[in-house]
């Protein structure tokens, strides 16, 4: 077994939240129990598409927002 990863602190929907260092946005969405295609995401005020979440490693101090996608026509 590997050693536990250190924790980083970030803001999740305006509240303090910690995750292991190296966690991706995709991993956090799943760990929080969300269905990935039912939630939209932004980090530091910038929208992050579902296809880009696995590549977006969270950093100490990031501000993450999870919200319902807006659909319609």
State where each predicted segment sits.
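Ubiquitin-like/PB1-type beta-grasp interaction modules and other compact soluble beta-rich domains
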Residues: 1-72
């Amino acid at each position: 077994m590997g050693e536990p990863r250190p924790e980083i602190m970030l803001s999740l929907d305006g509240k303090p939240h910690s995750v292991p260092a190296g966690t991706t946005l995709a991993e956090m969405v799943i760990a929080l129990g969300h269905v990935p295609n039912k939630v939209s995401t932004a980090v530091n005020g910038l929208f992050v598409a579902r296809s880009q979440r696995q590549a977006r490693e969270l950093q100490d101090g990031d501000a993450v927002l999870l919200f319902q996608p807006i659909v319609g026509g």
